[in-house]
């Protein structure tokens, strides 16, 4: 049985990825005689989960054996226009009853990207009273914020992911300022 270099195989896959339908099985590659000695499914997830867990690939990337577990792709889709319908009535009710609300997004959040959050906030059509501006911690931009007439504040946290744990200090200061009624 002929063995293939993981680096060479990856290079071929990158070059040929536009010639295959997503989710199809590749049985032959140019430059190699006969069928491939393994099943190769095209598509980012189909290839990546096998390639990233291959011991030869890990060795070539100098990943120490046992230092990390099995590589698993956690999110195959990034939805820039997610509509969080269930949140809209909740926030409208807060506004009608005069409650303040804080909505925040990490600007590196790939679970619910900040563009999706901004889209559903815009759909509320609330007047803006403090337009888009940076909020600062120790003379550094920590994110951007906007305040609406209905006592709703929207903020982003720079270089943060989906939850506060990605930027705990910035998240704490943002919440501390908001809960005490200070501008971000």
UniProtKB/Swiss-Prot annotation:
Glycosylation sites: 93
Main location group: secreted
Acetylation listed as a keyword: no
Signal sequence, start to end: 1-22
UniProtKB keywords: Glycoprotein, Secreted, Signal
Compartments in which it is found: Secreted
MF GO annotations: serine-type carboxypeptidase activity
Pfam families registered for this protein in UniProt: Peptidase_S10
Single GO cellular component term: extracellular region
InterPro entries: AB_hydrolase_fold, Peptidase_S10
Gene Ontology terms: biological process: cellular response to UV-B; flavonol biosynthetic process; proteolysis
Family: Belongs to the peptidase S10 family.
Protein name stated in the entry: Putative serine carboxypeptidase-like 52
Organism: Arabidopsis thaliana
Encoding gene, per UniProt annotation: SCPL52
